[in-house]
Amino acid sequence: MPFYDTVLPIDLGIENPFESLISAKPYYFTERGSAYLGDAKEIMKQIPDSSINLIVTSPPYALVFKKEYGNVDAQDYVQWFLGFANEFHRVLKEDGSLVINIGGTWNKGTPTRSTYQFELIIELAKMFNLAQEFYWYNPARLPAPAEWVTVRRVRVKDAVELVIWLSKTPFPKADNRRVLQPYSKDMQRIIEKGYVAKKRPSGHNIMNKFRKDNNGAIPPNVLQIGNTDSSSQYLQKCNEYSIKPTSRTSLSLDIVFFTS
């Protein structure tokens, strides 16, 4: 097993490569990073100012039916999260990015949606720049809430979550050439055979330089990613170490921002 995939308990006496950044004792670490067990706001206080390039987080959603790890009610959510946001802003580098995956929720007892995540975005935009919003479409999501979707049939399946990209500067470190996708067959044909320059009904002029091969297509801000991998390394490792797995974001979702 490669070293970077090996969990290294700190009682092995192996040097933690991240001790220079934070003085807190990690619960465990690998060559790729350290995991800390505790109150995130308290642990972040030990991180130096302007030292982090990227923060990716998926905090507990304001769900009506509570998870065992705890959830804050929608009406209290914004103030609760701002306590973390202040620390995020402090530790983030000037050209760094904060990426937040946050799902929506329904108002209790009615087929109407809470606006808590939009209210949070408005507050965060007073502190950060809203670089871009992404939409995570998970085709494997269950048809919930059952009362409104499968019983009364008055709503459709909720399969999209917000992913918000925030930054301290309008120009955070980013390069979309690092997340290019394969060209469609139509685009491959245009590159090979050319394109007749003309004006589209929308008014856009499509010129010959449109056929330039840029090594891939720029992806949209809609991310179609399922999270049904029952044999993922995460679940395998939880089973190996007798750890109860928790809900998580898709690894593919994290990779989009780690490589940008």
Segments from the language model and where they lie:
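Core catalytic lobe of class I
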Residues: 1-260
